[in-house]
Amino acid sequence: MKCCQGPSGYGEFFSEEQARREVRRYRSKGLSKASRWVVDAVRERGVEGRTVLEPGGGIGAVEIELLKAGAARSTVVELSPGYDEAARELAREAGVAERMERRVGDFAGNGTEPADVVVLHRVVCCYPDYERLLGAAVEKARQTVVFTYPPRNVVSRALLGAVNLWLRLRGSEFRTFAHPPERMVEVVRHAGFEPYTHRRGGIWRGIALARDGRGLR
């Protein structure tokens, strides 16, 4: 999970070593099913010439695929500086480094420029204030917001509780959260976005919303 309670916990958990592991996995297997869904959801509404902003983008795999698909530029805002070196190397390898910008900081509190598309993949699950995070996303998104989250059910809440207990015993500040999906979606809809596609199965659920509100399928 690429998310956390605060910068210190994030940097501790998502280290340079973790970034290298993710790069190796991407090089050998490509995008995960959930990440591929995110890319496809963005492409469904058109990516050619668009700008993309991804808080918590990690090694930038989703951004790389969107840039390859025709996006004009992308920006990744990442809490952990440990991802930068590996991510920049991967972007150079993919031939998109000149079109990808990376910043270190809290997306919900920085001055990042707006973009056509905002992606929050595996991020809201561990940000304590989902209203603040998604509120920042809709302020920045001109056209589309896509986000993924773990299902809020007995099994997932028990699992996240066990993970948080383990982290607490280790003295880690990293935490995960199972925010209510309906309330998260309402934050985005309140800003004038309407859902157009869902990801309903798997560990990561997802929803994509657009300002034009052409309807959910």
What are these regions, as identified by a protein language model?
Residues 1-46, 50-58:
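Conserved class I S-adenosyl-L-methionine
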Residues 59-99, 104:
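Class I SAM-dependent methyltransferase SAM/SAH-binding core
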Residues 117-129:
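A short SAM/SAH-binding and catalytic strip from SAM-dependent methyltransferases
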Residues 127-137:
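A short, conserved alpha-helix within the catalytic core of class I
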Residues 142-151:
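Conserved beta-strand signature within the Rossmann-like core of class I S-adenosyl-L-methionine
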Residues 156-173:
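Short, glycine-/aromatic-enriched active-site segment of Class I SAM-dependent methyltransferases
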Residues 174-192:
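Short alpha-helix
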